[in-house]
Design a protein with these regions (language model features):
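Non-cofactor substrate-recognition interfaces
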Residues: 1-180
Length: 180
């Protein structure tokens, strides 16, 4: 937040203004937030009980990040370790063959609904919300029909969140993230 915006009256704000007014209504330590529950931002798949709550971890530093981060236990070793320790389930799908898999298949795209177990889909997938992104590659480089000029999945997701008024600000943040 821009400190100058703290002086802007809430009623003076108009959409598109550079300064977005805010007020600090309280302060707390990060440990005060542990076990707080929150609402799933993109409710495509229900991963199970206890998935959306604040947990404690010690591998994010002020040099590496903000100190509060989203974790993806299905895709990172550190995330998997801290999630398992706290009893947070990974976000996985059950395939039509009965296999438990991450949301992204072995080719680098979100599973298409037809490749998933019908009972799993019925019980756990918000078909309306997910179907627009089912079958999309997470990186354009994985899809031989796409180029660098085509819209990327991350941009499409950001635009969806913006259209649903679920995001405060979208910006690129370069950071280290091990992946294969």
């Amino acid at each position: 937040f821009n400190p100058k915006a703290a002086e802007v009256a809430m009623e003076d704000y108009k959409p598109g203004d550079k300064l977005v007014p805010y007020r600090v209504v309280g302060e707390c330590m990060g440990t005060d937030l542990v076990d707080s529950e929150y609402e799933q931002l993109i409710p495509w798949v229900n991963p199970g009980e206890g998935a959306f709550r604040v947990i404690q971890g010690d591998y994010v530093t002020t040099e590496d990040g903000t100190g509060i981060v989203h974790i993806a236990p299905t895709f990172g070793a550190d995330d998997a370790f801290v999630a398992k320790k706290a009893g947070v389930p990974g976000l996985t799908m059950t395939t039509a063959k009965g296999e438990t898999r991450p949301m992204v298949d072995m080719t680098g795209k979100f599973f298409v609904l037809e490749d998933l177990d019908a009972d799993f889909v019925k019980a756990n997938v918000n078909i309306e919300a997910y179907k627009e992104f089912a079958g999309r590659f997470v990186k354009n480089a994985y899809d031989p029909t796409l180029t660098d000029q085509d819209e990327t999945l991350d941009v499409a997701i950001c635009m969806m969140l913006k259209q649903q008024n679920l995001v405060f600000r979208i910006e690129k943040h370069v950071h280290n993230y091990p992946h294969c």
